Amino acid sequence: MKRKLFKSMWLAMLLVAFAGYGTEQNAVLPQMDLPKAEAAAKVAPAYEQEYAKVVDSVYEFIADGTSDNLPEQGRTGICEVRDFAKREAALQQLGYTLQDISGDGVPELLIGWISQKRGVGHYGKEIYAIYTFANGSVKYVAEVWSRSSLQLMANDNLVTRGGTGISHQVLAVEHLQPDGDLGCYELYFTWPKDDGLGVYRNMSCRSEKDASQETDMTVEEFNEMRSEYANNSVEIEYLPLKDFKKQGFKDLMRQYLSAGR
């Protein structure tokens, strides 16, 4: 009888011990506050939130013509796309991405033209507009339109090709500075002279003959150089504008932060 009583008491004490253990463990869990931590991890950086407003305004403009929120600067090439392409084609061919081309660790917003699809990726060399994030807000950097081209080189220099006619063609090589301004590397341009066209160069990126030096380059050599820059420009992986509403920037996977820096 005593042995049965002792056994019953021992089992009861064991159950109490296990019950207490479970209570202590459960009491710790609410202090971890996992839902709040997960929510914090999902908050996008300020630049993504502001860039999203720009891309959303482009989407709305292409989709239904609403231009109320479309930035004044950087819209020219985008407006041309809407004029010559049908709605669905424009939403498919216009792309957006984030890529750090200034080297400051904060990416720029690039909007451009998708020229091909490989696998699940969408690629193109042409950029229509670039925006950066400086002093807590979006800042316009550059844009192009018909008869001009803006492309990115492997060293993150930006190359603009264009002109106002046969006698005035331009090739500008610039780099984006951390403050959001473009710095000039060099500018080549053609200009009429007595015996035809001359090729001029300066480092101010202003096509002013008097502030430039005439080179010994022929127009043919100048055009070859323009073509070489175009051929050596890099492909950019874009996300199609049509997918912006459902995925935003999430599929970029922070690939825009330059791995080599």
Per-region residue spans from a language model:
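Blade-edge motifs of beta-propeller repeat domains
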Residues: 32-90, 135-149
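Surface-exposed loop/turn elements that mediate protein-protein interactions on large endomembrane-trafficking
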Residues: 127-143, 173-186
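Sec-dependent N-terminal signal peptides of Gram-positive bacterial secreted proteins and lipoproteins
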Residues: 3-26
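Short consensus segments that form the blades of beta-propeller domains
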Residues: 85-89, 116-123, 162-165
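Structural motif
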Residues: 118-129, 167-173
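Acidic/hydrophobic-patterned starts of short beta strands in beta-sheet-rich repeat architectures
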Residues: 102-114, 156-161
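Acidic, small-residue rich beta-repeat scaffolds with periodic aromatic anchors
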Residues: 22-65, 161-261
